[in-house]
Design a protein with these regions (language model features):
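N-terminal, intrinsically disordered, polar/charged segments of Gram-positive cell-envelope systems
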Residues: 1-21, 173-174
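Generic detector of intrinsically disordered, low-complexity, polar/charged segments
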Residues: 2-9, 55, 78, 114, ...
């Protein structure tokens, strides 16, 4: 069962601030399990791709236009799972790492990590540690996140590959 709870001591108050100039816009394709981060161009439109990578999508992820509202370094998402670099969205979804068994870098759930690029039974929008950390550090409160069924991803945009890990590997390789 998802609790969505976090101790206030876990919340990084620095990340409550509004992103500088609302620099980024995040778009997620449900069909492609892909997240693309865009930045503003000279015409003040979000058209310049900055990052593109695969994500795992939880069972409740649905089309929505939302925004980052709060962040936590670690968040307990169920009775047995935690995620790191968690960015909560206004629609109650989360952008975060794959799941961990405890609040330890050495206790990754390898099955969750290897599911990046697919649907998963737990969590919201899961990604590698490096990508979750990038969003955590660069996309502040009120950064728009648009979740859509599908959109065309230009062939110019390189979507990062996922290197699968062994079933007994408990550390994110990124």
């Amino acid at each position: 069962e998802t609790t969505g709870e976090t101790d206030s001591s876990e919340t990084d108050t620095q990340t409550q601030t509004i992103a500088k100039n609302q620099s980024y816009y995040i778009r997620i394709s449900i069909a492609k399990h892909t997240l693309v981060v865009y930045q503003l161009d000279d015409n003040k439109e979000f058209s310049i791709p900055v990052k593109a990578f695969k994500v795992a999508l939880g069972p409740k992820v649905a089309p929505a236009k939302t925004a980052i509202s709060e962040k936590s370094l670690w968040r307990k998402i169920t009775d047995i799972y935690y995620v790191r670099y968690s960015s909560r969205l206004d629609n109650a979804e989360y952008l975060s790492t794959a799941t961990y068994y405890s609040q330890s870098d050495n206790n990754l759930n390898p099955k969750s990590y290897n599911a990046i690029g697919q649907n998963v039974s737990e969590g919201s929008i899961l990604m590698t540690c490096a990508n979750a950390k990038w969003i955590y550090e660069n996309c502040g409160a009120k950064t728009t996140v648009e979740i859509v069924e599908n959109f065309d991803i230009s062939s110019d945009i390189k979507v990062e590959d996922i290197n699968r890990i062994a079933d007994n590997a408990y550390r994110d390789p990124t």
